Amino acid sequence: MPAASHATLGARTILAAAFACAAGLAMNLWMAANNRDGFDVDFNQFYAASRLAGSGLLYDWDSVRTLEAEHAPTVRNSRLPVVAFAEKLVCNLPYASAQAVWLAGSLVSILVFALAWPGLNRLLAAVALCWSMPVALGLVLGQDTPFWLLGAAAGFLWLSRGRPRLAGAAFSLCVCKYHLAVGFPILLAAQKRWKALAAAAAAGAVLLGASFWVEGLGWPRRYWVAINHPEFSPAAPRMANLRALAWWLPWPGAVEILLAIPVAYLLWSFCRRTPCLGLAAAGAAAAGTVLGHHGHAHDFALLIPLLVFTVQRPEVPIWLKSWAILLLTPVPTLLLVGGKPFLGQLLVIGFILTALLWECLVKTSAGAPPPVPA
């Protein structure tokens, strides 16, 4: 193909992507303008918690809600002491200034995530981010999911460049939502990336120890009570994870554990058979939303890498690509938060498990060797 034709094709692709991004942004801006839950509800809980970090009252609900009520509706705090203490870097500012800095940091984190994730098509990632209602919800509510994505992307970028210790340290930044990172140790162990796993464990141990320094020896008990309060997860049936599926059955805790075993094994097999680190990381992040005990609609921003990899790879069948494109629309989010959560759960959980299983079956039939650890 002549160079001029290549240039024309490239320009058309960029224009189409720009149009798609503009349409997605317009849709999400309209959603934000009609938001009924209030802006920065989650940021408000982080702001209040950071003011109490180090006082021994971080999980004292009366103290927390008194501070939260100054700015927005009250939400129960669920962050570890070291996370709440670190948020003082922003939350020591006046509330409006802290809001602006938090939003700016979130936007930068999302941009770096899209640029840094190994192997991700940047144009498709930009379109996916602009169309993603979970990303928009996270920004509107002031969630810390963007910082989780930043830590994950930085970790896998360093891992792809042969810097496993730096990668492990970066993974520890996912401590803000540690339950969603449960797929990462499975990936690192499956691919025998022991240096990165050891570094992540060491960094995590340091952060855990720092939590005792911040909040005293009794914080684990107070934290356990806080996260098991009925008001902490009032919308558990609307989550798209194993906990939500087990919610309707007898002995839901035992059912969730039993369901987690084959899902963890599927992720292990997927990571063993996938030589592309970016794709394996995408599967681990997506599986974390299924295995994690707690996760709302905004947390499904973690699916974006797997959705983009599914769309960008020519060998993926059209029916699986179409499923991924459907998940990039507002449909699953609206189903989860609306009156049809079970349909949303089937769409989200079904896609993640199907994508991992398809990859395992293809790699098994092709006889691909396991990836070489960095």
Task: Report each predicted region and the residues it spans.
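Primarily membrane-embedded glycan-assembly and transfer machineries that use lipid-linked glycans
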Residues: 2-166, 188-304, 308-313, 320, ...
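Hydrophobic alpha-helical transmembrane segments of integral membrane proteins
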Residues: 130-131, 174, 181-182, 258, ...
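Transmembrane helices and adjacent periplasmic/lumenal helix-loop junctions
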Residues: 171-187, 292-299
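Membrane-embedded alpha-helical segments of transport systems
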Residues: 176-179, 205-210, 324
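Aromatic-enriched
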Residues: 311-374
